[in-house]
Amino acid sequence: MSFGPLVTAGWLREHIGDRDLTVIDFRWHLLGPDGRDEYLRGHIPGAVFVDLEAVTGTRGGGRHPLPAAWQVQDEMQKAGVDDGTKVVVYDDAGGSVAARLWFLLGWFGHGAQAVLDGGMRAWGEPLETRIPSVVRGAFRSRPPDRTRILDFEAVQLLEGVPLIDARAGERYRGDSEPVDPKAGHVPGALSAPWVENLRADGLFKSAEELRDRYFSLGVEEGAVVYCGSGVNACHDLLAMELAGVPNGRLYAGSWSDWSHHDAPVATGKEPG
């Protein structure tokens, strides 16, 4: 039976004690509280904390380069993950951070990973502060599919392929830019803020609604997505998979890479 890319809070409540399940708390905030501190104050029972920075590389453009295979392998082993383990990842940010680990696990060949739909908000049960005792797992990273990753040079050469900007509309338009040196977007990019993949209650929209959203933008198989640093873009990649638009690709360095180059910048609500 296939697993993922989403599980409901009801499913997790039913399976929380399964021996072949690992729950990972992946909370992180760009300009907010420390995720580990939040984990220590309370987390889903049995959940193990994994820090975004621990699965972020040191080579490549942007603020959050993709990790080396050994980094993901080591962190997953420390979390108790084996090759056959189902992994559920959650955050408190609508899945916009958890989707990054979902993407990385798939990219490194795990194949049994899911995001908790609605995250902490949907859990709705008591939290615990006890740190679980974990037996080191035997997870092994497989060689990643490099065709799903684009760098600055590859994005410059894109022709006839939709380029999607997953950031908030104000950052796309260039009205504000909280962290990077330039405001605006990559010329030609279409605005598809990740938050619009969600309903008002914080759950993902239906597959049909997501399909309508992305097809109306002209998104097709092989579309490229970017955000600020390659984290939140994975939310759009997950939504595209739910919508039946497979093989989405990631501009890993995203705007934090593009804006540091001597490259053209578009502003306003049009792609430019």
Q: Residues of each region from the PLM?
A:
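Active-site neighborhoods of enzymes that stabilize oxyanions during catalysis
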Residues: M1-T8, E14, M120-L190, D262-G272
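Terminal peptide-recognition signature
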Residues: L12, A47, L105, A189, ...
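Extended hydrophobic/aromatic segments used for targeting, binding, or gating
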Residues: H15-G17, E208, P246-A252, S256-G272
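Conserved beta-strand scaffold positions in the cores of enzyme catalytic domains, especially
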Residues: V23, A47-F49, Q113-V115, L163, ...
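Helix-loop module immediately N-terminal to the HCX5R catalytic loop
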Residues: G57-K86, P193-A223
